[in-house]
Regions:
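Short, conserved, GDST-rich strand-edge loop motifs in beta-rich repeat architectures
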Residues: 1, 43-65
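Hydrophobic beta-strand positions in blades of beta-propellers and related beta-sheet-rich domains
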Residues: 2, 68-71, 117-121
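Conserved blade-ending motifs and adjacent loop-strand segments that build the rim/top face
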Residues: 5-30, 65-70, 74-104
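Flexible loop/turn segments at secondary-structure boundaries
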Residues: 6, 16-18, 47-50, 116-117
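Extended hydrophobic-aromatic, low-complexity segments
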Residues: 6-10, 39-42, 49-53, 81-83
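Entry beta-strands of beta-propeller and related beta-repeat scaffolds
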Residues: 36-41, 104-109
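Extended, compositionally biased alpha-helical segments that mediate assembly or anchoring
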Residues: 110-111, 121-124
Length: 124
């Protein structure tokens, strides 16, 4: 809140690893705040594990072969929803979520695979 008190705290469980440090923008996450909601964008496999106490775990991804883009939205009380924005079958390139840029009420991600590049704009 505006007094600096912690109202809620949540973990986002995501297993990830990277062999090449240049690939790290593809496997991390981006967080932004809009309309009193916190949004987290992540690349992960499509297999999501439901844990106890309303928790979920996203498995890591090999961004070359499996890069699904998810968004998690969390309200002021810590309640969250998640959904897949793009599957690896729908996008031609993996998106660098850790390098997202917030512009007004949107976030823009750059996708890249070899020489192929693509921009993705998501309205919050």
């Amino acid at each position: 809140n505006n007094k600096g008190d912690l109202i809620s705290a949540r973990n986002i469980n995501k297993r990830q690893s990277v062999g090449n440090p240049e690939d790290s923008p593809f496997i991390s996450y981006q967080s932004c705040l809009s309309n009193k909601k916190n949004y987290f964008f992540i690349n992960a496999k499509d297999k999501i594990k439901e844990l106890s106490n309303q928790r979920i775990e996203f498995k890591g991804t090999n961004w070359l072969t499996n890069s699904n883009l998810f968004v998690i939205s969390m309200n002021e009380k810590g309640d969250f929803l998640y959904k897949q924005i793009l599957s690896d079958e729908e996008n031609d390139v993996p998106f660098m979520v850790s390098k997202g840029v917030v512009i007004d009420n949107s976030i823009v991600f750059l996708g890249r695979k070899g020489k192929k590049k693509q921009l993705l704009k998501v309205t919050l």
